């Protein structure tokens, strides 16, 4: 049974079991130790290549299932919103099937509030609300009711985030949804998700730079649930090259790839500067 991702440098009975299976399939010469070394890495990559899997040398959920003939978790069983394009759903589904339950749950939570940039979205599923957290301290969803939105629009210090017609756009969207759309800013999305899923306590709060700089370890091999970081901004990497990010008043919460984001005011996709690094969260 799959319990964790296995990679070079790790050890344990599950590593030995995987190595023994690779031996029986002819990909590894011998399996006498419980350590995932260089020979194991090469054999895993060879197995992945031969079986149409992502060749990353990591025994994730899909690679484990292929090794042992298990189908306990498949992309079909992962509830990715049907409003996304088939290519996005497939890429994200494959990635989510290979990570831990908590990473998958965090990503699926964020995805339900995202509009896909490349799919000509008709409505925002989540608003960009400066200073807002996706989940409140009582773990309730931060739904932008009529009174909340009007109070937000009265705050002159936040005008740079909703002026120029963005307030009208958001109010129209809210009316169509019967004021059921949640709101947050970029760091508030991450903070809210961390609260909701018990990674940090309900009082946890931090800005984008603190989240990336103090709560992650930089990685060049991101997996679903890692954080996408740049100065003053943060998003959630959900796999397959996609991120969920609260991008701004004219954009709301979006599923983006290569920082291409849909502008609901202009009806066009914009390209933003690349992420500076990905961070592997220290708590999960």
Please provide the spans of the model-predicted regions.
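Acidic, Ser/Thr/Pro/Gly-enriched interdomain connector segments
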Residues: 1-34, 73-78
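Conserved hydrophobic/aromatic packing and binding residues within compact polymer-binding modules
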Residues: 44-48
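N-terminal capping segments
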Residues: 65, 75-187, 191-197, 231, ...
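Short, basic/aromatic beta-hairpin or loop at an interaction surface
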Residues: 191-210, 236-239
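Catalytic Cys-His active-site segments of thiol-dependent hydrolases/isopeptidases
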Residues: 202-204, 236-265
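Loop/turn positions that initiate beta-strands
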Residues: 225-226
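Low-complexity, Gly/Ser/Thr/Pro-rich intrinsically disordered linker/tail segments
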Residues: 265-284
